[in-house]
Design a protein with these regions (language model features):
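Inter-helical junctions in multi-pass inner-membrane proteins, predominant
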Residues: 4-6, 106-109, 181, 185, ...
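Single transmembrane alpha-helix segments in multi-pass membrane proteins
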Residues: 4-91, 252-263, 352-353, 357
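Small-residue faces within membrane-embedded alpha-helices
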Residues: 9, 13-20, 37, 41, ...
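Short, non-helical or kinked segments that cap or interrupt transmembrane helices
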Residues: 24-43, 80-93, 189-192, 212-213, ...
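Short loop segments and helix-boundary regions at transmembrane helix junctions
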Residues: 27-32, 71-143, 183-185, 241-244, ...
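Helix-loop-helix "hairpin" substructures at the membrane interface of multi-pass membrane proteins
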Residues: 56, 158-237, 260-265
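Transmembrane helix-bundle core of multi-pass membrane transporters
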Residues: 98-182, 237-242, 279, 283, ...
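Cytosolic-side transmembrane-helix boundaries in multi-pass membrane proteins
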Residues: 137, 177, 195-209, 278-373
Length: 373
């Protein structure tokens, strides 16, 4: 929980969280968006292009959002207008997004000073904000290594020093999404389209319009996540920059049970595990094994006592023992496996959370106007 690790975790959680918010908007309207990864890819390229073209990182933010929206528009045409299977359309978006940005890089970045077929020139830097009056006191407390208190000081330092304005914008989008989707008539109608579209249609709701709006917003958010990677996380566009974060964002949606708060928690968890493996390698990831073992024990007890599922509890308990044995007999995790930590965490969390999930009732279900007749 050092300040550096927390700061890195925050930066790694933002693109996952933005992609997850995009998936949340789309799926709450009943459209599965597997194409988040492709929309993020478009956001990384268009974000870099916009920042270079207009010499402003904020122009890159807008361009990244537009790039993601373009990918979302294709997805909406296919799924909402023409009724194409959502999974097929999303996979196509992912494939097309990668190929299209590679072509654009050869066309635009190749030949620029510092650019090439796989990367852009360095991009204009995004501004940061710090609460300077807190830095020295928190640094002092963190250096004392007091139990809990120093860890808390490290967390506070990580989230109050050198935070980009883009990060603050991304964080604010979480409560804003909650307010729009759960506290406004627009959000109520949109969620109705994902739960009971036929009933919504019978009440005069234009289901097509709301599904289109949700998918476009989904693309905008995913594009913002991609733009964050190129503008803030790296300061440069690189081919393959997203690294599967669109898929992890979709996993964060599922982990959060299709709610913004849970989604933010999932993004923070995945970002933190990613930061551990990047900053401190196998030793820190090894320490996570004990946490995982204790978590599995708690799940086993819950399955046995509350759910009366003896077989499932036995399997979970055996896995917990196996994880603890690995922790006890080793001192570190081989470097070859540390890079897989975020993805392994994703799989583990989803397997544990799957028992309490409730997706929107009409998520992924084809809808045609007039079905109620």
């Amino acid at each position: 929980t050092s300040a550096g690790t927390v700061s890195a975790a925050l930066g790694l959680a933002v693109p996952i969280g933005l992609a997850g918010l995009g998936g949340l908007w789309s799926e709450r309207a009943g459209v599965v968006n597997i194409g988040l990864e492709g929309m993020m890819v478009l956001g990384t390229w268009f974000g870099a292009w916009g920042a270079l073209q207009f010499h402003s990182p904020w122009a890159g933010v807008v361009a990244g959002a537009v790039g993601g929206a373009l990918g979302a528009a294709i997805h909406a045409v296919a799924t909402v207008t023409f009724g194409v299977d959502h999974i097929i359309s999303g996979v196509a978006i992912n494939i097309v997004g990668v190929g299209f940005t590679q072509y654009l890089s050869q066309l635009v970045f190749d030949g620029m000073p510092g650019g090439g077929t796989k990367n852009s020139p360095p991009l204009p830097k995004m501004g940061t904000v710090s609460l300077g009056f807190l830095d020295d006191p928190l640094r002092t407390v963190e250096a004392k290594h007091w139990f809990v208190l120093s860890d808390f000081a490290g967390v506070l330092r990580g989230i109050t020093q050198g935070v980009s304005w883009f990060t603050i914008l991304a964080i604010l989008l979480v409560p804003l999404s909650f307010y729009v989707l759960w506290r406004t008539p627009f959000g109520l109608r949109l969620r109705a389209c994902g739960e009971r579209p036929v009933a919504a249609e019978s009440l005069g709701v234009n289901v097509y319009l709301y599904k289109w709006a949700a998918v476009i917003v989904s693309g905008v958010l995913a594009g913002l996540g991609g733009a964050f990677l190129s503008l803030v996380a790296a300061g440069i566009y690189r081919d393959g920059q997203t690294g599967g974060r669109g898929y992890i964002g979709l996993a964060a949606v599922i982990f959060g049970n299709w709610r913004p708060g849970g989604l933010a928690g999932g993004a923070a968890l995945f970002g933190y595990t990613d930061a551990l493996q990047l900053r401190q390698g196998g030793i820190s990831v090894h320490a996570l094994l004990l946490v995982v073992a204790l978590l599995l024990v708690a799940v086993a007890v819950y399955q046995l006592v509350r759910q009366r599922r003896g077989g499932a509890a036995l399997i979970t308990g055996v896995v917990a023992i196996a994880v603890f044995v690995v922790f006890a007999v080793t001192d570190t995790v081989p470097e070859q496996f540390t890079s897989f930590t975020p993805h392994l965490t994703t799989l583990l969390v989803l397997s544990l959370a799957s028992q309490r999930l409730r997706m929107p009732a009409a998520d992924g279900v084809p809808y045609r106007r007039g079905q109620a007749k």
